[in-house]
Amino acid sequence: MITERLQKLRESMKNKGISAYIIPSADFHQSEYVGDYFKCRQFISGFTGSAGTVVVTLEEAGLWTDGRYFIQAEEQLKDSTIKLFKMGEQGVETVEQYLNRVLKDGDTLAFDGRVLNAKEGYGYEKEYSDKNINIVYEYDLIDELWADRPSMSKDKAFLLDVKYAGESIQDKLTKVRAIMKKQNATMHILNSLYDIAWLLNIRGNDINNTPVVLSTAVITLDKVYYFVDEEKLNDEIKAEFNKIGIEVRNYFEIYDFVKTIQKDEVVLLDGTTVNYKLYRNIPSNVSIIDAPNPTFIFKAIKNEVELKNIRECHIKDGVAMTKFMYWLKTNIGKIKITEISASDKLEQLRRSDKDCFDLSFPTISGYKEHAAMMHYSATKESEYELEQEEMLLVDSGGQYYTGTTDITRTYILGDITEEQKLHYTSVLRGMIRLSKAKFLYGCRGLNLDILARGPLWDLGIDYKCGTGHGIGFVSNVHEGPNGFRWKIVPERNDSCILEEGMVTTNEPGVYIEGSHGIRIENELICQRGPKVGLDQFMEFETITFAPIDLDGVNPEYMDKSEIVWLNNYHKEVFDKISPYLNEDEVEWLKQYTRAI
């Protein structure tokens, strides 16, 4: 099927004189996860991961993806003729290096300019400006092949009440306009769905598990133009927007609107989130400031109301996770449980709380060697039945009106080897070491990542991903500019100074291909610690509360401070979660939060 699609794509390319065609993962807004309409890269390659770029030439094809997906991509591409390029690995060509090698004098490089960001687009422009290589950005060639392509979402939007958001739309606009004035901008084009959701306190269902609305906002110093499918807006939204001067326009009208921008305007935009076609439609005599959206940092630093809500929703999430662990541990070997039925049970427990309206991403439920694929997705064909042996990794989260959660636990279902216990305990040690870090203000995740990775590096083991990511508020489960990783990855934009109020995950892991995978993940709020003289120290507050499976822990591998932290953490889990459990669950929880 994939080879047939590639053949048809190449026929179309030949007819149009195209030598190479780029198919990224993004939608028109550079979203990480996308709606079904935008899954062109998945359609042409069969690779289902959330990140990757396909390049097709008339002779060959390649997929570039990151370390989270190496194992999965190898499996999904094996019969496709598409070559896997492992991004970030030594000696592996980047997309740009590959194109420079294969494109010849007179060739044409093409892509849909709506799904490539402006920075990438003008990067290609600059690269090939002095070479005889043409760039065409008006072709959506996949649309021609995809006969039963899903339509764009028509789901309704809703306003997020200020009791959850903590700030009014007007107050947020005032903050954005203050930054615009500082930068001498008269207009700001905001194309990131997550930033628009934060700024306008609007949420929707246009991307599975990510409550955003397909839209673009243009902010001037006294007005806002909001480009959206108006059918998605209810009367409450229209009334609120009308009251504060937000003018609603057709979603696709933005491309013509920007053509009319006057030359005396100074436009602020972020070239990594504005798409290339939108950027190219702005008249060339208009001054452009290409800089991060002001909302990028505003939404990352949670306000006091958001933090209060986030803490509350993590208790609810912890109750669901604890009930799930009880169900799993007491039923394994007694009833049939599969990777999918376990995932379904957890979703049922989460959604039993009326505050939970969705998952924050498709649950990763990986048993045995499946857990070595960081973002494994079980299917009816691939799923395993769980037995009283080995380990089950479950990475999951919920969308609550009070916040977004992300938690991973690895459960011991029976006998495991001493090596697996060493791996499990080392992952736990790394998670603990980062959790209890004290550091000077000015540190970035780059400075702290080794705390989590250190126990594994001591064993000669690494994991091919960051240690943690920022997390949105009733928004995308992955959010910058905060994160933990050991080296700078510019396109991730997640290595900022850690500020008070930022929420970041802490999730070291071990992934042994063909054998097992282990990950333990909590969320952390960055907060001020003591000030000593002129030195402001910072620390983390752990906000995730669910038992860590002690059946995988060998205390002999831990130092005293790590054991003290774990015992204190489990006492807090019991104190916070037990009031919401039945009698049997409470008795069971005593055993799984015992001091070691």
Give the label of every model feature segment:
Residues M1-I596:
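Active-site neighborhoods and metal-handling regions in enzymes and metal-associated proteins
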